[in-house]
Amino acid sequence: MTVIPNVVSEMPIPVMLAVIVVLVGLPIIFIKDALTRSKGAMPAPTDVRKAGKGNEWDKLNKHHTPKLRGSRKALATDVHARLLAPSFPYALCHGNPVDALAVSEPSSTKEMLSRDWEVTNRLELLRQLYWLLQEGHRKDFGHTREQCGNPSWVKNRLARVNEVADEQTDAWEERWRIHRFLNNDRGINDVDFGAWDFIRAAMLIRAGAALGFITDEEAWDTLAIINHALHMSYSSWDEAWDAFRLTRWLWAAKGQAQEAENDLHDRNRGEFLIGKNGLWTAIPWDLPSPTSRFLLLDVLATEGGLHLLSPSGWEDASAWEREFDTQTRTRAPMSIGGKPIVH
């Protein structure tokens, strides 16, 4: 019984102080980690700490901590939260309440729409949404991926872009993407790019509704379209997230340093979405969502803004794109190939 007191009495004061600090600090660390996890975050993984990126991870935890007006548990039964789910990735980055059709900073949201999307009014927003739902970036990425299976095209195209890649950003990025497809980096040749377009469309809907460019009714209805598109394209939140982050990587087309920074960002963001306490984890993938009336198409029909897939486009289209085109045809004028709605 006297062993411990004897050891303590013989312990040098600096060592004793260090032991006390450890004994006091460990519970604090455990409590801090528990609180962090309860918010959907995860303490920096071992490999991140070893790489000297622990501080960056901690900053990302603060950046991505979700703003909830309700509880995380309520997400599973909240119809509106289910509709808003595709907008969560950008809500985390923008500091918006994930479970409400609102933004935290209207002025910066307005600036973002104008700067990044050239959207300053209702019609411009509707046209951007229509483009994302009908074809988006996935059309060009899919075309490039297909062409990369043709050695002759690859040789000629690389010869052209190599001439200007050092001076033109677009050419440099195209060359970068061609090599990614040729090497099948990150399994990019098997990725369905749709999530990249659908999730960005959900972000635009939140922003547009908050700024009054579209009505709440139009916003909820178009979010229902996006949820349906995701369900037709993927089998789980995990699969949708992987498709989004990989297509975002392809779109960004950055050098190694920036690529590593983006990877860390999305790894952290993914913890808040599909981690053990993630927002998407709280919402069952197969939870039913309201059926859309495709109000977006009704509005654009009055503006002459509808376009139909060509026969060749139809052949290459996904199941979702064909359904969207069918809905478009029932509203488009006969002069461009539309047909009257059949009841």
Regions found by a protein language model. Name each.
Residues 1-11:
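Short, strongly hydrophobic alpha-helical membrane anchors
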